[in-house]
Amino acid sequence: MNKLPSNIEILIVSIILIIGCQKKNEINSSFQPIALSIDLPYNFPVIEHPIDNPLTEQGVLLGRHLFWETKLSGDNSISCASCHLPENAFSDPSSLSVGIHGDLGTRNAMVLQNLAWSKDFFWDGSFISLEKQILIPVLDSTEMDETWSNFFTEIKHDNNYRRMFYEAFGTVEPDSIHAVKAIAQFLRTMVSSNSKYDKYLRGEAVLTPEENAGLSSFNSLNGGDCFHCHGGILGTDLSFKNNGLDEIPIDSGRGIVTRETKDNFKFKVPSIRNIEYSAPYMHDGRFNTLDEVIDFYSIGIHPNSPNIDPLIEFASQGGVQLNPKERSELKSFLLTLSDPDFINNTKFSNPF
């Protein structure tokens, strides 16, 4: 004869089930994020971090893992780092990046350095938040072609990720907002500030005569005339300009975003820091070498390019007309902007 379970037996079974569920969801950790600050040289501007996404040790660690995570792509073949390689100052050595389906992107992958001071992202400034910008490559069918929901389904039972998300954000049910915040935190720690030129400014290094001549040319209206757009410690004024690349441009650039005719064919002024490592150059990666870039500004500017920036003061004569010696000197100075400590920093390397 079957005996009905007693109330005590039912209670015991219920407790066992509850404990089993708890163990399944248990995170062997605690939510105690540790604030992280970045040590900056005295001559760098203060970083204003978003109020809703302050730097923490746990958030940066999670972001580093996600930056290198191939599961963020539809076929698990590429990560953010696939198009932003450390040895290339976290840019792509190809003119246009290749997505998981073999499709080419439309613009060159930008360098990831000193993003903590940027207010606009992508070549056309289509996003004013680093967090929002990070959402896009994962979803873009020509790039990673994945959905954030698929990614979180895939890592649902990954105890390492469960622990890291909990330690960073105090949740066992993370979503894309948590992920992009973590990646943004990681990217904001990627500060380049220890080139030879930085050391020179701090009195820790001496420039050679050729490098000094290049620096003078860089800052001279009658020389390279580079300082208008690339002066300052960041190597960019963070503005959008048309530098006269084409007589008849194809890509409308900033104008696509603002829908203002005056912004057509303008692109974000890239930083010249680590320019030695970040070839190819320009928004479409048209120049393969630094020499080609210097030659362009010397003799290759198209003066009739629509909306050419007025700061390109020598456009009417095709450029600043540097002679071979002056070009060599300018290049020597630009190479002092290389920061090997940045590209070799193990804090940015693959954690897997």
Where are these predicted regions, by residue range?
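C-terminal soluble interaction/assembly domains
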Residues: 306-318, 322
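Mobile amphipathic helical/loop "lid" adjacent to a hydrophobic cofactor/ligand pocket
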Residues: 130, 141-146
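Post-cleavage N-terminal segment of exported redox proteins
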Residues: 2-60, 136, 145-212, 216, ...
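Short alpha-helix boundary/capping motifs
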Residues: 91, 140, 158, 193-194, ...
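Short amphipathic alpha-helical interaction segments
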Residues: 264, 282, 318-326
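Short glycine/threonine-rich turn/loop motifs
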Residues: 26-136, 198-309, 343-352
